[in-house]
């Protein structure tokens, strides 16, 4: 992704055909080392293409990907509601879940992926 972003920065900055040297210069400016193999792959794929057309094609492809809405799950016919005696057990399970969540958040030092 960093190579594509650097290529786009160079192209939008007026360089219609950025070279590996141009992209390395952009990456070096923010302290990122460039992998020549990946860099050359990005350049060979994007070389000579109109950036606006590539972006439009990407947007079209992303539009066809499902965006993960909630799936409705209905209860099976004839299934009974839980008995009233199971309510304390459910509350106890929630306490256990909350305790486990707090332990998990310590693993990522408070920086969760979806926070």
Curated annotation (Swiss-Prot):
The modification Phosphoserine is found at residues 19, 79, 86, 102, 105. The modification N6-acetyllysine is found at residue 21. The modification N6-succinyllysine is found at residue 21. InterPro entries: P1/P2_N_sf, Ribosomal_P1/P2, Ribosomal_P2. One of its GO terms (biological process) is cytoplasmic translational elongation. One of its GO terms (cellular component) is synapse. It comes from the Eukaryota. The keyword Ribonucleoprotein applies. The modification N-acetylmethionine is found at residue 1. The keyword Transport does not apply. Residues 76-115 are annotated as: Disordered. Keywords: Acetylation, Phosphoprotein, Ribonucleoprotein, Ribosomal protein. Residues 91-101 have a biased composition (Basic and acidic residues). Residues 76-90 have a biased composition (Low complexity). GO terms for molecular function: iron ion binding; ribonucleoprotein complex binding; structural constituent of ribosome. Belongs to the eukaryotic ribosomal protein P1/P2 family. Heterodimer with RPLP1 at the lateral ribosomal stalk of the large ribosomal subunit. Plays an important role in the elongation step of protein synthesis. This is Large ribosomal subunit protein P2. It comes from Rattus norvegicus (Rat).
């Amino acid at each position: 992704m960093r190579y594509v972003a650097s290529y786009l920065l160079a192209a939008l900055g007026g360089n219609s055909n950025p070279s590996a040297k141009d992209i390395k210069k952009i990456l070096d400016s923010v302290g990122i080392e460039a992998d020549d193999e990946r860099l050359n792959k990005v350049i060979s794929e994007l070389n000579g293409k109109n950036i606006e057309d590539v972006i439009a094609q990407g947007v079209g492809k992303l539009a066809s990907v499902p965006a993960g809405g909630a799936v409705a799950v209905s209860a099976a016919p004839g299934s009974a509601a839980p008995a009233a005696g199971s309510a304390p057990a459910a509350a106890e399970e929630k306490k256990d879940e909350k305790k486990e969540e707090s332990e998990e958040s310590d693993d990522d030092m408070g920086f969760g992926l979806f926070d």
